[in-house]
Amino acid sequence: MVGGGAIGCESGYFFASEWGAQVDILEMRDDVCKDSGMSQRMALIPRMKKAGMGTYCSVQVQEITDNGVKYLDKDGVEQFDQADLVLYCCGSRSNDDEVKALEGVCPHFVVTGDGKRARTVKEATYEGFCAAMDIL
């Protein structure tokens, strides 16, 4: 898994615990799950360890190849993590093409969630709830 945020960690845990896959997380920040709440981190990280997942933090991915990932470890030493499959779970941004296409279609138009900016499911759901309450 390239990316150790909530999505990368949760997806990796699923593959490790349900399918028995050997999962390594490569994260550029100094820890995994930093975009998760404390209770989620306290529940998920021990389960990730129990499932045998490897976590490599403070790394810089250099290249994704046909058989794995080249990266620089926290000391700047080039490493290679062999993998049959690499999931890229990082760097999200808003895609506003659909928002632009819908502008002017109706008199009152509210943009929420990832249409506005990339965010977590929790944040997007709350924003959608607030927009719905404004209608009422």
Mark where each language-model region is.
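Hydrophobic Val/Ile/Leu positions in short beta-strands of Rossmann-like dinucleotide-binding domains
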Residues: 1-2, 25
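Short glycine-rich loop/turn motifs that provide flexible caps or phosphate-binding loops at active sites
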Residues: 2-4, 90, 112-114
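A conserved FAD-binding loop/helix module that cradles the flavin
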Residues: 7-15, 31-41, 103-104, 109-136
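A Rossmann-like FAD-binding core segment of flavoenzymes
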Residues: 9, 17-101
